[in-house]
Curated annotation (Swiss-Prot):
Signal peptide: none annotated. It comes from Lactococcus phage mv4. It comes from the Viruses. Keywords: Virion. Belongs to the Lactobacillus delbrueckii bacteriophages ORF1 protein family. It holds the Pfam family Phage_min_cap2. Coiled coil: none annotated. This is Structural protein. One of its GO terms (molecular function) is structural molecule activity. It is found in: Virion. The keyword Lyase does not apply. GO terms for cellular component: virion component.
Length: 123
């Protein structure tokens, strides 16, 4: 193609046409035409450090959600064997982690409470 500029890598250099490459499986990239000297990048720019901090906070939320599920499973097992002391301990742990989730969500506007992540399958 005579319009190709060797100054820029082609889309094929980034795995276009392969599942792991650009526009492959689960790829959310979008293609836009680019004309040198004319095109202006209007995409939203993100602060890298803020994104890392937000990711760490979100990881903490996911940890709390995993703990809620773990303690709910233990509580279910305690109910099935009739251990009321363990049930009370599990209920307390569940409330403690749910409280931590409420706190972290209220302190960070980019987070939302996702109750389905706290549910367990009743087997």
């Amino acid at each position: 193609d005579p319009r190709f500029n060797p100054k820029y890598p082609t889309i094929y250099d980034y795995g276009y046409g392969t599942p792991a490459g650009t526009l492959g499986i689960n790829c959310m990239h979008e293609l836009y035409p680019y004309v040198e000297g004319v095109t202006i990048n209007r995409q939203k720019h993100y602060d890298e450090q803020e994104a890392i901090r937000n990711g760490e906070i979100q990881q903490m939320q996911r940890y709390y959600e995993r703990q809620v599920r773990k303690w709910k499973q233990r509580k279910l097992a305690a109910e099935r064997i009739g251990n009321t002391n363990l049930e009370a301990k599990c209920s307390s742990a569940i409330r403690r982690y749910q409280s931590k989730i409420r706190k972290i969500v209220s302190e960070n506007d980019f987070l939302t409470r996702q109750y389905d992540r706290e549910k367990i399958a009743n087997i």
